[in-house]
């Protein structure tokens, strides 16, 4: 086992503070509309330029082990806030640094760290309650665009695109962000349910120009096993042909004799048919087949449920106004399922999302939800260089996440003003002793820090003067760092999602409290391994004359 080095109390906390400050100072220059860019060296490829706090935080790795532990703890604040709310990472970092700095002063003066932590926790609880009180819900396209603009580092084009996408697919709809082939950034909306499986044979194509199979007023057969024998498929195929309507077959796979027979009948014109593999794998495939069945008013033919393919009747088939397939995707538009069943299924999936503990499962459930409730919007992000495209794509993803947060929990006034207004909530915090009271005062001081930093990044105005001016104001009145004017910030479009502000404070206080109550740090002792000796001139013995 490697030998360990242990550092205690004041020495440990001082070193942790150096690490916290190094990371926080690199991150906080990006805060606000006047925030600066940070250039990050990449071992392979061009350097990355970013104004995204969490991207900067993730790149910081310090040489000293204990300093690095301090930096990594604050990095966790930024990452957690980004994961939960999509924005507010820089605010969270600034708050964590301020809480730790003020807390350390009091620990050095003899305050008990555990009571400081209890005071901080009580203060945060009251501030969060006050934030919820001053929060207002958003619904309009204009308000959504404002949130998107702020979260995309004041890029109105991105804000408008996100508002447009939410307008098209609804607030529960799936919005994906992809890299465009050209320089233009555009929104594309896929209506209906789309899944990533294309036709099994190009012979099913009905439009040879676009290489698509288009089925109007289609019947849909949904089967959860492989079909290789024509005998089991024939009865339902004959019933479908008698109706004169095109038939889409969705199954785990269709191969051999069954696929060949379908292709031959399609080419002869005796049968309008197309076959496609079922989407997903395992339990997710079963769930998606059930979704398709509910959307189209059909039944999944499954032996687990007691249904056999050879006994299937036309009543088992789903229906849709249009189905279009290319080699990669299948889109079902206007399924004929009942609204009651679709709504019940949507509520069931929402319940699963609430209980889900995995980000991956949550994402897949949200995709299923969107496909049932309104479609998918794709934001194709264009830029003139790869560096710009990556930076812009990261901003769009953050803005999208933050906009969803705003729809969930509402908005508060931006520009650091909401935290100033929420200081009022600290009057309700009841400490049990003086050290807890000090913990509450630490939060009071820390809540001013984001506004101070936003002003500092403008480089033209004194933060203390602005702070007093804003404190003397009321409601939405604050300092607009973009125009450097005092005005009603909500009317000026300077707003933050409540979830972002709340998460930033909760995560910052949590990590800063852990750091304050840390009494020892344990790290590996670095081994001094001697450098490899240089090779003697002339190479190894017996290699004379080699070049």
From Swiss-Prot:
Its main location: cytoplasm. It is an enzyme of class 5 (isomerase). GO terms for molecular function: ATP binding; ATP-dependent protein folding chaperone; isomerase activity; unfolded protein binding. It is found in: Cytoplasm. ATP binds at residues 30-33, 51, 87-91, 415, 496. Residues 527-547 are annotated as: Disordered. It catalyses: ATP + H2O + a folded polypeptide = ADP + phosphate + an unfolded polypeptide. Keywords: ATP-binding, Chaperone, Cytoplasm, Isomerase, Nucleotide-binding. The keyword Chaperone applies. It comes from the Bacteria. Residues 538-547 have a biased composition (Gly residues). CDD domains: GroEL. One of its GO terms (cellular component) is cytoplasm. Gene3D superfamilies: GroEL, GroEL-like equatorial domain, TCP-1-like chaperonin intermediate domain. Its EC number is 5.6.1.7. GO terms for biological process: protein refolding. It holds the Pfam family Cpn60_TCP1. NCBIfam families: GroEL, PRK00013.1, PRK12849.1, PRK12850.1, PRK12851.1. Belongs to the chaperonin (HSP60) family. Forms a cylinder of 14 subunits composed of two heptameric rings stacked back-to-back. Interacts with the co-chaperonin GroES. Together with its co-chaperonin GroES, plays an essential role in assisting protein folding. The GroEL-GroES system forms a nano-cage that allows encapsulation of the non-native substrate proteins and provides a physical environment optimized to promote and accelerate protein folding. HAMAP family: CH60. This is Chaperonin GroEL. It comes from Chlorobium phaeovibrioides (strain DSM 265 / 1930) (Prosthecochloris vibrioformis (strain DSM 265)).
